[in-house]
């Protein structure tokens, strides 16, 4: 049993090993699911992870920097990168999934937003979400991905 600390609640329990798994399974798992669905694969045959707590000197225990590689036999591979210590966008997105193909790239940032570019970076299609969100609000269920998770959960209950 662990002593009560106010830093464990409400959202911050993710960063302590007794209750959470860090960013990899907090938000990372949602984007890896999108990758798996897009690649048409189920479970990885090999997983490698490197990372640690390099930037912040606080009581959180899980990595603030992490890279996980997933191998799906000879079918496909993908990687997930978590940089809680540095929010510099990758390909213009703070979070999301990217499929790099032979003729272009598909970026999915969540919340019904995606962008398709050709190999030269020319935008072929750019779809923006009509969802309003506050990036600093960690508890509001109307935030990007959470809204869809709640909708799915309620749909499952109704069935």
Task: Give short role names for the model-derived ranges.
Residues 1-159:
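Contiguous beta-strand/loop segments that form the cofactor/metal-binding neighborhood of enzyme cores
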């Amino acid at each position: 049993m662990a002593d009560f600390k106010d830093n464990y609640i409400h959202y911050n329990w993710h960063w302590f090993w007794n209750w959470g798994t860090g960013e990899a399974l907090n938000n990372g798992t949602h984007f890896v699911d999108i990758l798996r669905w897009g690649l048409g694969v189920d479970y990885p045959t090999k997983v490698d992870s490197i990372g640690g707590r390099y930037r912040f000197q606080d009581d959180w225990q899980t990595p603030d920097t992490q890279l996980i590689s997933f191998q799906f036999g000879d079918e496909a591979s993908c990687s997930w990168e978590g940089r809680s210590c540095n929010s510099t966008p990758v390909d213009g997105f703070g979070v999301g999934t990217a499929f790099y193909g032979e003729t272009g790239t598909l970026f999915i940032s969540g919340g019904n937003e995606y962008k398709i570019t050709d190999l030269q970076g020319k935008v072929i299609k750019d779809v923006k979400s009509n969802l309003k969100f506050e990036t600093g609000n960690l508890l509001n269920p109307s935030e990007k991905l959470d809204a869809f998770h709640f909708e799915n959960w309620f749909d499952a209950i109704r069935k």
